[in-house]
Regions:
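Hydrophobic transmembrane alpha-helical segments in integral membrane proteins
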Residues: 1-22
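Helix-boundary and loop/linker segments of multi-pass membrane transporters
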Residues: 1-4, 78, 264
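Cytosolic juxtamembrane amphipathic/interface segments immediately preceding
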Residues: 1-7, 34-43, 109-113
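Non-cytosolic membrane-interface motifs at loop->transmembrane helix junctions
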Residues: 11, 76-85, 144-156, 230, ...
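Long, contiguous internal "core" modules enriched in hydrophobic/ aromatic residues
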Residues: 17-19, 39, 94, 102-281
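Transmembrane alpha-helical segments of multi-pass membrane transport proteins and ion-pumping complexes
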Residues: 24, 165, 282, 286-287
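Membrane helical hairpin/interfacial module
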Residues: 24-99
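Juxtamembrane boundary at the C-terminal end of a transmembrane helix
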Residues: 283-298
Length: 298
């Protein structure tokens, strides 16, 4: 727990879950926009499952509201829109939740118009980008040198690009599970998406691990009149190792689930477990950032 009422746990949960849910939603929205030729029933199933990443994002947003004292205080943050990084973060998150929620609810309409649905999905994708931008730079505080570094935004984005595609992969696999089994030597074009998403996650993991090591080394060069920042996170190296190991295991589980042609249901189970492990790995990557809180004063 920081001085000033900030909770490392609530903020870590927010920056792990909200970006993961938002990026996963954007991936699935892009999938729906690109694969418009699929049957309406098939698209409806996937659109209904948009609730999963939306719920993950909501969980993160609710966690973030707790460190404001009361969730109602989040409404007051809107007053600083345009001049306060926190206000920009809150408003962009609310905008995403609003349009993403509208898209999900509209999918239950008896005869939804494709143009309206596609428009809501496109706006939601834009909101995700804006939300990631403002969330990444919300911690650029000059009086907190451990946060005021270029490593802060890129680390958060790397974590989001790890967990978001992993979550989207699981949702897509849930849709594919309902389809008739295919011959193992043939993969429909749209079924290549989960593999592409996992490739993005692997690249994000590799880049994110390097960035975490850079941040750990950076903390050794920052301090105030009391201590060095590195002393605040003495187990940073072990956390990075655990984060990387868990993420590799989770992604391996998901890849195995995708390639398990004998039983798509079992494959989905592997994917769900793998996704959960990846999200835990993302949480491990976020905790050291908040534990390293160090102001320039005493």
């Amino acid at each position: 727990m920081f001085d000033g009422g900030f909770s490392a746990t609530s903020l870590a949960v927010f920056t792990a879950l909200a970006p993961a849910g938002a990026v996963a939603f954007a991936c699935l929205a892009a999938f729906l926009l690109v694969n418009r030729s699929q049957s309406r029933d098939w698209r409806d199933v996937l659109a209904h499952l948009l609730f999963i990443p939306l719920a993950i994002a909501w969980a993160g947003f609710i966690a973030s509201a707790t460190h404001l004292g009361t969730p109602a205080n989040a409404l007051h943050a809107i007053n600083g829109l345009g001049r306060s990084p926190l206000s920009n973060e809150v408003v962009s998150a609310v905008a995403f939740l609003f349009f993403a929620g509208m898209a999900w609810m509209y999918s239950y309409r008896e005869k939804p118009k494709a143009s309206v649905m596609n428009g809501l999905l496109a706006i939601s994708i834009v909101c995700v980008i804006v939300m990631l931008f403002h969330t990444s730079f919300a911690y650029s505080i000059a009086t907190v040198p451990t946060w005021d570094t270029w490593l802060t935004p890129v680390n958060l984005c790397a974590t989001a690009l790890l967990s978001g595609p992993a979550l989207a992969t699981t949702v897509l696999q849930a849709v594919f599970t309902d389809e008739p089994a295919l011959q193992t030597f043939y993969v429909r074009p749209y079924e290549q998406w989960p593999y592409a998403l996992l490739l993005i996650a692997v690249a994000a993991l590799a880049a994110g691990t390097v960035l975490l090591v850079c941040h750990m080394n950076f903390l050794g060069t920052v301090g105030n009149n009391v201590t060095l920042a590195s002393a605040l996170v003495p187990n940073y190296g072990w956390l990075i190792a655990a984060h990387t190991a868990l993420a590799i295991c989770g992604l391996a589980f998901q890849l195995h689930g995708l390639r398990l042609a004998t039983s798509r249901t079992r494959g989905l189970v592997f994917s769900v477990i793998g996704c959960a492990v990846v999200i835990i790995a993302a949480l491990l990557a976020r905790f050291p950032f908040y534990d390293a809180y160090l102001s320039v004063g005493f």
